[in-house]
Amino acid sequence: MVIVYGIQLNIIKHLFEIERKPRKGLLAVEWVIMGYLLLTALMVLFTFTKAVNPEAMLWGRFRIVLLTVAMWLVYRLIPCRFTLLCRITVQMLLLPWWYPDTYELNRILPNLDHHFAAYEQWLFGCQPALLFSQAITHPVFSEMMHMGYASYFPLIALVALFYFFFRYNEFNRTMFIILTSFFIYYLIFIFLPVTGPQYYYLAAGVDNIANGVFPNVHDFFATHDKPLTMPGYSDGFFYQCVASAHATGERPTAAFPSSHVGITTILMFLAWRSRSRLLFWGIMPLYVLMCLATVYIQAHYAIDVIGGWVSAVVIYIVLHFLCGKICPIKK
């Protein structure tokens, strides 16, 4: 008990110990977010007459700027590990706000799902997202798939907190890679309006999809955001977790490449780089389930998964290189 108590005190001491060389300005990742914010704000202004909620989008961005500045001031007043963690945590908690925002920006563009579904058919000779859940219907398998999908944000938090507590010198650059990756994907989603099977199959007609017919739905999703009923064991705990998350934040956007697969692949790279076998192999099963689940629950085409893998490799290599320039390891 004495040893445990001593460890707890040591952790608390490190959390609130004033840093000798506190960071003076915004973090690199905060600059990235401000850049994304400015770029998308300009897009809202240029498409103001076509956008559905332009005032709310601009006001939301203004509040994010104020919140970012406020967290910077808190850190400057008390420059310690805890306030730095708070700065990062705030930006992480804002991701669910940024995600549906991509739909508000890309809904004015013509939908491209018919091209992706047709390419999927050419590549695989079928629609894996349509057949996967039909082929394996057992409740246990369904729950495994939904557990994998529901593990998305817990996996991000796990890797982030591991670096914070055990690799603090690399925490800043790790969060730069994770958060910047998100905003790279968001930028892609804005200019590549693909909704994925859960939306396109309903709009095009499941019978058409089963017969290999993929009609162009044009701007259908500009005014429609209803998805198919998610396949799987609907009474399952993890099924309900995913269903609840989709009900609150899902939109017909962000299908290609799969950011779920892309981000978790980047997490695997970071877990490997952490030199912790326990972390890497501990999250590996959930990573595999994630890659399968995106197709099983019809959130993505199979080619979206492939796109997630390829994009993750490219993004990680580029950001890892940039880290050496703008996020040096803090000694």
For the regions a language model picked out, list residue spans one by one:
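Membrane-embedded catalytic cores of phosphoryl/pyrophosphoryl-handling enzymes
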Residues: 27, 235-331
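Interfacial segments of alpha-helical transmembrane regions
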Residues: 85-90, 158-193, 198-212, 283
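Hydrophobic alpha-helical transmembrane segments
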Residues: 63-67, 148-160, 255-267
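N-terminal transmembrane-helix/juxtamembrane module of multi-pass inner/ER membrane proteins
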Residues: 3-64, 82-86, 90-156
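Hydrophobic cores of alpha-helical transmembrane segments in multi-pass inner/ER membrane proteins
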Residues: 3-9, 64-76, 154-159, 312-314, ...
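Membrane-interface helix-boundary motifs at transmembrane edges
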Residues: 20-24, 52-55, 75-87, 163-174, ...
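Aromatic-anchored segments of alpha-helical transmembrane domains
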Residues: 37-45, 94-100, 182-190, 285-296
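Membrane-interfacial catalytic/cofactor-binding modules of polytopic membrane enzymes
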Residues: 191-273
